[in-house]
Design a protein with these regions (language model features):
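N-terminal/domain-start segments enriched in small and hydrophobic, helix-friendly residues
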Residues: 29-30, 36-43, 55-57, 63, ...
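Short, low-complexity N-terminal intrinsically disordered segments enriched in polar/charged residues
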Residues: 3-4, 8-41, 45-49, 153-160
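A solvent-exposed, acidic/Ser-Thr-rich amphipathic alpha-helical stretch
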Residues: 52-100
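Residues that line or immediately flank small-molecule/substrate-binding pockets and catalytic motifs
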Residues: 8-11, 54, 58-59, 102, ...
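Hydrophobic pocket/interface hotspot
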Residues: 33-36, 46-48, 55, 74, ...
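A beta-strand edge to alpha-helix "cap/lid" segment located at domain peripheries
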Residues: 20-24, 41, 79-160
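Short amphipathic alpha-helical "recognition" segments used for binding
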Residues: 6-9, 75, 79, 143-144
């Protein structure tokens, strides 16, 4: 009888312990990603410390700057060449939602900027996966049509 009580006690406590540890991981991952977004534009060296050595970034969509980058090219090319060229006055990022589940974190963000061809106020879904308390995978989803027309002087043409 005593064995059964201990067995059921363990059976009852184990799932809640596992669930609590899952929440700790999610909270920890949110802190990493919060710090990344707090620093990426103003203090990129701090943000880059939060990126895993095997990092992969992809600006999703079909556009001139929609490409894949690794840790080195994310900093040297994306942050130091691509973004300054198309957003010479910078961009303001307003976080609207934060979602974490397991090793994944998703932020939705509203951007406000003037692109080289006019107002560029795009909405983003930033999908990140973490490993060893660092960001290892990052896909940035946005309106590639808006990116093309405001950042690259492309025009929409009627086909009629």
């Amino acid at each position: 009888m005593k064995f059964l009580k201990i067995f059921f006690l363990i059976l009852f406590l184990l799932p809640s312990t596992l669930l609590a540890n899952g929440h700790k991981l999610e909270e920890q991952n949110l802190k990493v990603v919060d710090s990344f977004w707090a620093n990426i534009l103003s203090n990129p060296d701090v943000a880059m410390e939060l990126i895993h050595e095997d990092f992969e970034f992809e600006f999703m969509g079909i556009c001139e700057i929609c490409k894949k980058y690794n840790k080195e090219t994310y900093e040297s090319t994306w942050l130091n060449e691509v973004i300054p060229a198309v957003l010479p006055n910078g961009i303001t990022l307003n976080i609207t939602n934060r979602i974490a589940g397991g090793d994944m974190v998703v932020f939705t963000i509203e951007g406000e900027a003037d692109g080289i061809n006019g107002e560029y106020n795009n909405n983003y879904a930033m999908v990140m996966r973490l490993k060893d308390k660092k960001i290892i995978f990052f896909q940035e989803y946005m309106s590639d049509l808006l990116a093309e027309t405001r950042l690259h002087k492309k025009k929409i043409v009627d086909i009629d």
